[in-house]
Swiss-Prot record:
Keywords: Amino-acid biosynthesis, Cytoplasm, Histidine biosynthesis, Hydrolase, Magnesium, Metal-binding, Zinc
Pathway this chain belongs to: Amino-acid biosynthesis; L-histidine biosynthesis; L-histidine from 5-phospho-alpha-D-ribose 1-diphosphate: step 3/9
Origin: domain of life: Bacteria
Family of this protein: Belongs to the PRA-CH family.
Residues bound to Zn(2+): C79, C95, C102
Quaternary structure, from the entry: Homodimer.
Entry GO CC: cytoplasm
Top EC category: hydrolase
Protein name from the UniProt record: Phosphoribosyl-AMP cyclohydrolase
Source organism of the structure: Salinibacter ruber (strain DSM 13855 / M31)
GO MF, one annotated term: phosphoribosyl-AMP cyclohydrolase activity
Cofactor: how bound: Binds 1 Mg(2+) ion per subunit.
Chain residues that bind Mg(2+): D78, D80, D82
Length: 127
């Protein structure tokens, strides 16, 4: 049996759809990644975020290496059907650089500034 969200999602010609990930408790935008129909279905089936890595050309379960998992609280589809929004419970940091959010850089008059502190050491996690 197919899922209504999967049926309504409009994937690109290369089989991908962007997924924006937001903290369900704080509303902070954590990251954006891509999904395939298969990783979307796995996410819906398991309640854990599963993505498609464009650089490695393989699926990846968020937190499988780092332990910084994302548990789905809610899934949404935008008005055009071509972008997903997941509200998640984030364990640890979402960003592979060690920050809670991948959007930790903010434009300032003199360049970029960093918001927040690292919540983990990526060198210790990704050896």
């Amino acid at each position: 049996m197919s899922d209504p969200l999967l049926d309504a999602a409009d994937f690109t010609d290369d089989g991908l759809i962007p997924a924006i990930v937001q903290d369900a408790e704080t509303d902070q935008v954590l990251m954006m990644a891509y999904m395939t129909a298969e990783t979307l279905q796995e996410t819906l089936d398991t309640g854990r975020m599963v993505y498609w890595s464009r650089s490695r050309q393989e699926r990846w379960v968020k937190g499988q290496t780092s332990g910084h998992t994302q548990t789905v609280e809610e899934a949404r589809l935008d008005c055009d059907g071509d972008t997903l929004l997941f509200r998640v419970h984030q364990e640890g940091g979402a960003c592979h650089t060690g920050f809670r959010s991948c959007f930790h850089r903010r434009a300032a008059d003199d360049g970029w500034t960093t918001d927040g502190e690292k919540v983990f050491d990526p060198d210790a996690v990704y050896e």
